Amino acid sequence: ECELYNWDPITYQANDDYTDYHNYDSYYLVKPSYAMDSVDTYVEKVNGYGSKNIGMEDIGNTLAGDYNPKDRVSREAALNLQVKKLQSLKQGGNKVMITSGNQYAVPYADFVTDMNLDARAVNIIDEQVPFYTMALHGLINYSGGAINLADDEKENILKSAESGAGLYFTYIAEKTSVLQDGKYTRYYACNYDDWKKDTLSLYNKFNETFEGTYDKAIDKHEKIAEGVYKTTFEGGKAVVVNYNYSNYQYNGQEIAARDFAAVKGGEE
C-alpha cells in the first residue's frame, strides 16, 4: 500500500497545513489484487444481509497500477481487473452504484453518483454542452455531487435539472455538532432531521417535473437566452432552467428566478 497526501503546488511538499485546514486525511493506494479481494469480502458481507445493492467508492473511479518490479501491474491491467470484477458483480445479480463514472465502468453500473456536471470551474470556458450526460441519459441513472455538500446548493440543483440528473444527498443520523473540531467537519450539513423536509419537497418537485423522462434520451440541449437553458427529452417533454436572478417568460409561462419548470416541447 502507498500513503498519499495533499501536496503544495509551489513547494511540491506534503502540505500538512492544507490537510489540517481543509480536514482532509491522507489516503492509501493499495495493490490492485488486494483491492479486488477486498471487493469480494465486501460483497459477500452485503449479500449475507440479503441485499444485492453494491456501492463502490473507488472501483470505476480511481485507477492505479502497481510498479513493484516483483509483481508489476500496469494501469491498463488494473483497468481490466476492475472491468472483470464489475462484470462478475452484474452476473451475480447485483445492482452496482459507482462514484464519478469512468467510461470503462459505466456499462456495468446501475447508478453513478458524483458525476461532474459542471465545467465552469475553468475560467476560460464561456459555454458548455453536456455531451456526456446527453449520451448517457435514458441508459443509466446518474447524479451530480451531494446537494447538501455543495458550495452552492441552488446551483447544484439547477445544474442537475439542466442535465436530467437525479438527486443525491449525504446524511448522518447524529447531530453535526459531534463533528466539531474533528477531521470530518466538511459534513457539517448532513444531519438527516435538518434536511428531511427540504429533501422531500425537492424530490417531489423533481418527480413531478421529470416524470416519464428518466428512461428517455435527451434529444436537444439549447441556450434560449442569457442564463436560460432548455433540455428536450425523447417524446417532446422539455425543461427550462433559469439561472438568472429575475423571472423569465417562455411562451407565456413564467419561469421563476433561480428555478426550473417543465414546458411543452417545440420551438420558442
Predicted regions and their residues:
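Active-site-proximal substrate-binding groove within the catalytic cores of carbohydrate-active enzymes
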Residues: C2-E268
